[in-house]
């Protein structure tokens, strides 16, 4: 056989062998590389939400006072948050007030008590800024409070209820612990439906004063 043909055959055989070796090497590297996650982890919501999620949904949430009369269904997961600090203290105070008032509290009563702590709607506060905006917009938007008109009230009055996120992240037991700390009583001694005298402003003020100084869940 001519020398040129033999040389070409050797080159072709060598090239084929190199191709086989390259394919084997690529297959080996692919098997050793971890598979990328098909779904990226969800990022926390913009408002202090943590990584732990609950499958509950926000069912009746109004984002601003102007939308309170037309409550819309919002289908999104309720995420447990790491809501801390002075705003948490203010929130827990309002939740406690709502609970002891029979699961709802009129806005006038809330501001009557907050006013004794130096918080007036529309007036800047050194810690909270505009407290009305924090309570009626931020807490409502985040799902901690429901803020809506009192039925058949004239002139129109508003009242607060626990929001869906408050039910997820807190409980009436935690609120009773909070109130019991003010009263120096064990929460197990409290009946589930505490008969609260709405005229007892001193007790209400004591609860919110305690909350304003700081609260940590038991």
Curated annotation (Swiss-Prot):
InterPro entries xref list: MAGE, MAGE_WH2, MHD_dom
Stored SMART domains: MAGE
Keywords noted in UniProt: Phosphoprotein, Tumor antigen
Official protein name in the record: Melanoma-associated antigen H1
Bias-annotated ranges (Basic residues): 1-13
Modified residues (Phosphotyrosine): 194
Bias (Low complexity) ranges: 61-72
Pfam families hit by this protein: MAGE
Organism of this sequence: Mus musculus
Domain MAGE residue range list: 1-197
Region annotation Disordered: where it falls in the sequence: 1-75
